[in-house]
């Protein structure tokens, strides 16, 4: 959920959250992440769309307070640490974009959409 907020994956819907049953251990586990991508075309003028799933009743302008409220609801331990780890991935994304020689204007356009919660 936090990755989707930070990296602007607004196509975050219920079909993108699932569990896998481990028959040997007779337990359910959260599935690995999938279908996560930047949702806008950085070369076009666009109106930012709202998220498919709400966070704390909101689909736009998600704040740290909204995320922490949900973290408390789901008894997530150390939510600020998790948020920071995800936000630290922005640096990694920039490094990879540069290694791939993505056009600077596209990288800059995408980077301006990233959300910093802390």
Each language-model region and where it sits:
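Anionic ligand-binding catalytic core segments
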Residues: 1-14, 18-118
